[in-house]
Amino acid sequence: ENNNFKEDKKQTRGTKVTSFDKTIEENNTKYTQIEYNNTNYYVNSRNLVSDIKDSVLEKTKYVRTSVTVYENEKDSKISSFIKKGNEISITGYDILNEDGTVNMYKISKDDITGYVYSKYLVDTMEEATANYNENSVYDTHKDRKYPGRELHGGKASTLDYYPYEKPQFKDNPLMKNAKAMYLNAATISSIDSYLKIAKENGVNAIVVDIKDGALAYSSEVAKEMSPTAYATAMNDNSAYKSAIDKIKESGIYAIGRIVVFNDVHYGKDHPEDCISSKASNRLWPSAYSRGAWQYNVELAKEAVHEMGFNEIQFDYVRFPEDAYNMSVSGNSDFKNKYDEEKAEAVQNFLFYAADQLHKEGVYLSVDVFGECSGEYVTAYGQYWPAISNIVDAISSMPYTDHFGRSVDTWSNPYQTMNNWAKGAAARQKEIPTPAVARTWITAYDTPYWKPTVIYNASKIEDQVRALYDNGLDGGFITWNSSSSLAKYEQIKSAFAKNYE
């Protein structure tokens, strides 16, 4: 008998249906009657299982993008790391996504076991070893290098340029046109004075320190993972939370800033995670250190839960400024357990951090040096395209007095920022999923070592205008390390301007 089957609809893996004993056969294939949404259908009998765990049949996968291996499927604890191009065995999974794909696979590889995100895995070795080259993306980056010498920051050719899905949280929209103030941890007791300026002048985002050397409040994560840092807490937790609540109640987007690898307190508690070098006596946790990764991500997650931030901003996501000298000295130990290049470590950390923070319903932004607008991987491991492609917002720091002392670049902020922004805008176009470009601007009298130019509202406006003139329209954050109330009073009218 010919049943004249025709396809009606497809169901994703993991869909729950009611099956009946009735089966029919066509073209040597058995079909079982099912009910779904009060309608009867026939499906290939081989596609039905009684236990949802049996719906995942794959036994082998291949690593397309180097992956962090987690101890379990629930938290941020790191078990190991597996590089691109490796075959791994699938031994289980956590949950199925709405589209039927697996969220995390339970895997094994030699003596490594744990969980990895399925989005970084593919079905064949050919796919795993390929580089993303749609619109010649990989070709754009693969041969880039600093002219004249090797910086030892890594090769652009070893970095990942596959599109990274950027979430949009319905109850927490990403700030895409920021007019942002920066507040250090010492300002918490004066929050009302800053909010008065903010509310009256169109400030729509505020960056507040969580950790910059000292902690802004008494973190339980730090108490466990870095007691030395815990002892530095500057504010009462309730006072700090009250300040963040006031920011959000004012309709202002709250960004929590964490200085990541430049952390002497964590370094004192964990010297095993720090770079050791005769070329430097700095106590600097290595960007290769998974212990430092986990500490900062757990600190960020705690801040989201306890304080209610909309976004976490990571600063100092890099190796030290003197990483070049450390590298060429030949007597430095960067604690490079997994044989990564510096830029690979930075990018791999950001994959890890973004995955963890997106689970919490918040965004990740990262600060980078102004130098990163160039067409090369820096000595300290930052490469704009490899970072912007992953994070939700990228905040470069092209301060006008940071372009050398031979020319007074600070006296004409529009020209200086305009020249810089051309490179940054070009970098944004070289990747499939660029971040929002939200730029730090100079909001202090310059140059910093001997101020001679007053940076008033017009100087702020000049910088912002240059950004928008070059298509960097994600907004700005004013950098004033002391968070001077007097300076904010002086420049407040610049926030009220329309730059779009």
How would you name each of these model-derived features?
Residues 191-216, 306-311, 393, 467-475:
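Catalytic domains of carbohydrate-active enzymes, especially glycoside hydrolases
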